[in-house]
From Swiss-Prot:
Biological-process GO terms, alphabetical: translation
Positions of the UniProt region annotated as Disordered: 1-26
Gene Ontology cellular-component annotations: cytosolic large ribosomal subunit
Keywords from the named record: Ribonucleoprotein, Ribosomal protein
Family: Belongs to the bacterial ribosomal protein bL27 family.
HAMAP family: Ribosomal_bL27
Domain of life of the native organism: Bacteria
Single GO molecular function: structural constituent of ribosome
Family annotation (NCBIfam families): L27 (TIGR00062)
Pfam family, one: Ribosomal_L27
Protein's recorded name: Large ribosomal subunit protein bL27
Amino acid sequence: MAHKKAGGSSRNGRDSAGQRRGVKRFGGERVLAGNILVRQLGTRVHPGDNVGMGRDYTLFATVEGTVKYEKYTRKKKVQTRVHVVPAQA
């Protein structure tokens, strides 16, 4: 016979790695064309001037310049938009 009662097994003990989403370039930072500005799920931040959006909603710069975020009101909702102000040649 066993001298100790069998211990129960836990159903916890798992965790997945984070997906590294969030703002990658903040307002006022200089960026090159192709630099990623925001990684997100859905359009929490909308693309503005000189900003493209990938199929996973990643926002990226299409020109070299300076990042600028703005809040704007659309209907009854305040949304955030990100622009890249082109560098002076």
